[in-house]
Amino acid sequence: MTSLLIGIAQDGGFLGGVDEPVYTFFPEHAGKKWIDRKYPITLAHLLTMSPAIESGDAVESAEAMHRSGDWIGYWLDLDQAGVPGEVAEYSSGPSILLGGVIRSATGKYADEFAEETLFADLHVSSYRWQKAGDGTRETGGGLTLTAYDLAKMGQLVLDKGMWNGKRVVSDTWIAESVRRHLPLAEGALGGSPYTTGFAYHWWNQNYQVDEVTIQAIVARGYGGQYLGIFPTLNTVVVLYNGEWGQPSERVFDYDVIVEKRILPALR
C-alpha cells in the first residue's frame, strides 16, 4: 500500500524521484542523527528496505518505536551501520518514514492521501489505519482492509496501474516497483524459502508447479495475510488468517498452500 501511494505521489508531482535524500523531508526533526549528519539514505533505500541502519531485531525495534511516542523521530535517530542499497532487511522503519514522506510532500497523512486517490478510485471505504498519538500513521503494517479490497490492490498491479479504464498509478511506477531490486540480507525477517529478492515493498517469489517456475509478486501481513499477484496466470490470490503471535515461519505455510493446492488448480 505504501509503495503504491509513493508512486501516486510521484506521478502527481509531489516527489521529484526516488533518489531524493530522506533527511530533506523532515526539517522539523533537526537534532536527530539522520538530519544533522545528512545520511545518504534515499527514498529508494526506504522502498527497498536497505537504509543500512542499526535497528537491531525487527520485532523489538518496532515495539521500541511504539513505546517511544515519536515514531518518526525514533527511526531518524538510529545510527547508520553500513552502505545503503546493498541488501534488503525487513523492518517497519522504512515504511513508517515513507508515511512521513507522504505527509511532508503532500500535506496529508497517508490515509487522507489514499482516500483522495487510491481508495477513491478503487471504492475502498471499509478500512482502519492505526495511528500514534501525534497523528503519525502506522504505514509499516497498521492498515486493516477486507480481503476483497486487498484483492483490488493486487488487480491494480496486475493491470499495470489501471482500474476500470482509469489510470490510477503510472505503468512505469508499477514496472519499477515490482521488479527485483535487491537480495535479502542473510537471516532477514520475512523472507521465505520461495523468496528470490525484494522490490519496492514487494517480495519477489518463485513457485514450482510440474517443473514449471511461476513468478509472483507477494505482500504479507502480520497474522497470516497474503496477497499474491501472478502475471503469467493473470491471477490474484488473497488468503486471510488470524494467527497472531505465531512464529514468523508459520507465514510460509501459505506459500506451501499456494504452490501445492492453488496454483496447480489454475494451470
Predicted feature descriptions by range:
Residues 120, 125-184:
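Flexible, glycine-rich surface segments
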Residues 1-18, 46, 98-102, 150-156:
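Active-site SXXK
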Residues 94-101, 141-162, 225-242:
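Active-site-proximal alpha-helical segments within enzyme catalytic domains
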Residues 124-127, 178-236:
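Active-site Gly/Thr loop motif
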Residues 34-37, 83-90, 138-144, 219, ...:
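Solvent-exposed loop and edge beta-strand segments that line ligand/cofactor-binding
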Residues 12-52, 77, 106-141, 145:
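Active-site helix/loop module of the DD-peptidase/beta-lactamase fold
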Residues 13-19, 57-58, 103-115, 161-169, ...:
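Structural helix-adjacent loops and short alpha-helical linkers that scaffold large soluble proteins
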